[in-house]
């Protein structure tokens, strides 16, 4: 009986030790980057207010094509401003807090996308 208890205790300790090596639940994501194409042309922007699901820690790539320079405002913590020139640029961001992040053009007074971070 003592031998059984000793073996059971050793197995229980080993399992507890192994579970401590698991995922810490951080904000990293193994998901592929979320690609969002943003086009500014003739005073208009697309997309226009779409809601897009994003995982915490997932890379989000904004591919911005514009016919003139401008700025995108990202209402995250901390807030971010993405300045772009005429032509095409790529901006890579990650969000580690759950919630809705609005991405907008202040010049056009328009929400481009709402990122649903979960």
What are these regions (language model features)?
Residues 50-68, 90-97, 101-104:
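Beta-strand cores of secreted/periplasmic/IMS beta-sandwich domains, seen most often
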